[in-house]
């Protein structure tokens, strides 16, 4: 039997996935079912754009529900407090600057299921996340960029994410 993929994530990330799943099941599904029933009442389904739109949305929601159930079932919640204080691991907040004179940047390392770079959460599977993992405060780390370029950063601070 094939081994199931695990989804490393923080407790906060797991809670967000569970909240999204609950919303889809308790709110979205019933709303879509109502839309489908209403669209059916319009008659001929072959040229009924409201019906087709609702069915498309239903398929999307059902796919997302299955995806969330899979990720929640095989979630591996990482406790950042058990790791060494100054070492970059999943669930840690990290500040670094580009060497020699870059601006300071701060990110939290999270599992790919909860990654959101625009809000400062980078995946442990991203090139940056992979490069930073297991390094500590004061380390200089080379982060790969596209087209065989790279940038060197110095880790300034590592702490447990809030």
From Swiss-Prot:
Any one Gene Ontology molecular-function term assigned to this protein's record: DNA binding
Keyword Transcription found: yes
Segments for region (Disordered): 111-132
Entry keywords, A to Z: Coiled coil, DNA-binding, Transcription, Transcription regulation
Coiled coil residues, start to end: 48-76
A Gene Ontology biological process term: regulation of DNA-templated transcription elongation
One Pfam family hit: GreA_GreB_N
InterPro entries per UniProt: GreA/GreB_C_sf (IPR036953), TF_GreA/GreB_CS (IPR018151), Tscrpt_elong_fac_GreA (IPR006359), Tscrpt_elong_fac_GreA/B (IPR028624), Tscrpt_elong_fac_GreA/B_C (IPR001437), Tscrpt_elong_fac_GreA/B_fam (IPR023459), Tscrpt_elong_fac_GreA/B_N (IPR022691), Tscrpt_elong_fac_GreA/B_N_sf (IPR036805)
SUPFAM superfamilies noted in UniProt: FKBP-like (SSF54534), GreA transcript cleavage protein, N-terminal domain (SSF46557)
Family classification: Belongs to the GreA/GreB family.
PANTHER family (UniProt xref): TRANSCRIPTION ELONGATION FACTOR GREA (PTHR30437:SF4)
Job of this protein: Necessary for efficient RNA polymerase transcription elongation past template-encoded arresting sites. The arresting sites in DNA have the property of trapping a certain fraction of elongating RNA polymerases that pass through, resulting in locked ternary complexes. Cleavage of the nascent transcript by cleavage factors such as GreA or GreB allows the resumption of elongation from the new 3'terminus. GreA releases sequences of 2 to 3 nucleotides.
NCBIfam families (UniProt xref): greA (TIGR01462), PRK00226.1-4 (NF001263)
Protein name per its UniProtKB record: Transcription elongation factor GreA
Gene source species: Oenococcus oeni (strain ATCC BAA-331 / PSU-1)
GN (gene name): greA
């Amino acid at each position: 039997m094939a081994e199931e993929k695990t989804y490393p994530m923080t407790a906060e990330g797991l809670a967000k996935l569970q909240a999204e799943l609950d919303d889809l099941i308790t709110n979205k599904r019933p709303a879509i079912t109502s839309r489908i029933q209403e669209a059916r009442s319009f008659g001929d389904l072959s040229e009924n754009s409201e019906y087709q739109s609702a069915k498309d949305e239903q398929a999307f929601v059902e796919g997302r529900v299955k995806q969330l159930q899979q990720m929640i079932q095989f979630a591996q919640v990482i406790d950042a407090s058990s790791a060494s204080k100054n070492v970059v691991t999943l669930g840690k907040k990290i500040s670094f600057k580009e060497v020699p004179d870059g601006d300071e940047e701060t990110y939290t390392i999270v599992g790919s299921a909860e990654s959101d770079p625009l809000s400062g959460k980078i995946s442990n599977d991203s090139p940056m996340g992979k490069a930073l993992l297991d390094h500590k405060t004061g380390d200089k780390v080379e982060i790969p960029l596209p087209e065989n370029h790279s940038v060197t950063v110095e880790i300034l601070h590592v702490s447990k994410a809030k």
